[in-house]
């Protein structure tokens, strides 16, 4: 840890690279009676991540952000090696938004060479939506988030609604494992033209960037139909698919309506429903979603 005492005194973000350093600092904070918030990230931060930090700062005395590209949530032929990274830029953003500490471990720090323990939800929740084409993804997510919970021992943890399935799965894991942690979901942050903020947006060419607007266009269409009284989830999904299919650079992975808590498929909108999608724009896989209960707000 670099200049931890001075960093705390001048309100500069602390950089921790080991589990021991994080635990020592959090112990000091908790001995002072301070509350701790956690914002897990894979780095290459944008305004969506900044909004999570802002929310955490507003609710907690100290905020820890993790900056770790977690290899266990990437499958074969996914973008682990090419995933964008810019740690110095991340630190500047975190400091600007009042983050207290960034945890930036190596893979070796987080996973022993012979690590053989994973955290996995055995219901159908991780098998729906993104899990259909990314079968090991949520096992990796649950494992790394569980490890971060054990390392940081936060009072609250903050996750974005853009990864809605992940948020639901983390809530279930916290319930099932009796973690004494409040999970706070935060709204999707969008570009001025509607595209959901994502680190993977940097993969898009200029033409693909324009084509990617079809995701938010489909979301806004779905929200409009719900506000107008549509309760047939199948009709809603069909209309959104037709919207996306009109874009020649778009290839649908899925568009689905599911129970917002269990992730089970639904045919009628008679409860809180998550309408989610994953769409390839060229070679880049993007996600977006909305909650039907938010449409009346």
Residue ranges with predicted function:
Residues 239-297:
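Phosphate/ribose-recognition catalytic cores of enzymes acting on nucleotide-derived substrates
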């Amino acid at each position: 840890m670099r200049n931890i005492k001075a960093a705390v005194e001048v309100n500069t973000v602390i950089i921790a690279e080991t589990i021991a350093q994080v635990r020592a600092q959090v112990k000091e904070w908790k001995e002072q009676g301070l509350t701790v918030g956690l914002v897990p990230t894979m780095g290459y931060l944008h305004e969506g991540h900044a909004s999570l930090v802002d929310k955490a700062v507003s609710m907690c005395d100290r905020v820890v952000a993790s900056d770790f590209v977690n290899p266990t949530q990437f499958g074969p032929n996914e973008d682990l090696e090419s995933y964008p990274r810019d740690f110095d830029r991340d630190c500047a953003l975190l400091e600007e938004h009042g983050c207290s500490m960034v945890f930036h471990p190596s893979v070796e720090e987080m996973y022993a060479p012979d690590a053989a323990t994973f955290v996995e939800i055995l219901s159908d929740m991780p098998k729906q939506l993104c899990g259909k084409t990314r079968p090991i993804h949520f096992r990796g997510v649950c494992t790394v988030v569980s490890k971060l919970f054990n390392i940081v021992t936060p009072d609250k943890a903050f996750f974005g609604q853009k990864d809605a399935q992940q948020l639901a799965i983390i809530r279930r894991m916290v319930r099932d494992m009796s973690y004494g942690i409040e999970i706070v979901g935060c709204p999707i942050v969008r570009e001025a033209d509607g595209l959901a903020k994502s680190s993977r947006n940097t993969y898009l060419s200029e033409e693909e960037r324009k084509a990617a607007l079809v995701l938010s266009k489909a979301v806004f269409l779905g929200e409009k139909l719900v506000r107008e009284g549509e309760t047939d989830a199948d009709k809603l999904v069909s209309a959104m698919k037709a919207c996306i299919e009109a874009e020649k650079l778009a290839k649908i992975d899925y568009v689905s309506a599911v129970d917002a808590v269990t992730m089970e498929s639904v045919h009628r909108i008679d409860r809180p429903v998550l309408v989610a999608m994953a769409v390839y724009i060229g070679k880049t896989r993007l996600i977006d979603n909305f909650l039907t209960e938010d449409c009346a707000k």
